Amino acid sequence: MTLSAFFLILFSAGLHATWNMIAKKERMSLAFYALLCSIGAFWSFGVRFFTPIGFFNMPAKFYLMTCGTLTGELFYGCGLVLAYRTLDMSTAYPMMRSLPLLFIPAITTSLGWGKPLSVQAYAGMAVIFAGCLVMPLKEISDFKPRNYLNRGMLFIILVAVGTTLYTTFDSQSQKVLREAYPEVSATMRSLSYYSFRALMLALIFWTIVACFRRTREEALGIWRRRSWMPFVAGCCSSLTYLSVLLAMNFVTNVAYVQAFRQLGLLIGMLEGFFILKEQCTLTKIIGITLILEGLAMTVL
């Protein structure tokens, strides 16, 4: 992996953690998330003018996979809003980012998508799961089933399920694009797909915002405050994706990208401690250590 790839991935990890920190600090609402999605749709809309990919004459499988992606994003966005209203970022962020690495292989293996996992990968997932069990506890002695039966854990699982769905279906949508447009470069296919995906996602969330009085009031509140935070978070979110796309051109194996992106877990926790002034506990330190070790075992 080149030095350029390393700095691009590090930049991406920092941006992802930062927009989550902004979301937590601003008490993110559905209107906030709709604005965030709109930024991605806006900057990528220009791709529609020079891409050779037409999205209105694709195979039926593409639309089915994209519906799966958008459903996952809906779960993710709603779960994220609720999770950050309930839990510290230093607890929620590492768990939300790592749990999909347990769920995604379960789905892809059961559906026969992708290569079978190694014994080391399964062992790594077990270590990740152990870390996730430790993260929300105040003390190790609190390790009891009833301490996991709460709204916070439900919202984290909702985010993780959403991430699992959109990651899995994104992969399949990209596969359909590769088969339909083999002559188009991978970067152009990815940018074209992101443009279509971002536009659909923004439309879905703005439709939800328009349908409910409370969410309409939240949107008006952001407008009255002239808050730039959703736009800053949206730029960070969009640049995160773009940085990953660019980094893929400088690595010999995309596993490196996946592995080093997990630096964001540590960055997110540190932002929770030092910027949001959240409590640093021994269980959080033990949990993040186990998660990072498990991730290394799984992706390397």
What role is predicted for each listed range?
Residues V159-S171:
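Transmembrane helical elements of multi-pass membrane transporters/channels
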Residues T69-E73, V81-F129, S195, L199, ...:
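Specific alpha-helical transmembrane segments that line the substrate/conduction pathway
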Residues T18, I22, G79, A106-S110, ...:
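Hydrophobic side-chain positions within alpha-helical transmembrane segments
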Residues G14, T18, F75, L99-A106, ...:
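Residue positions within transmembrane alpha-helices of multi-pass solute transporters
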Residues I104-T109, S118-E139, T283-L300:
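Hydrophobic transmembrane alpha-helices of multi-pass small-molecule transport proteins
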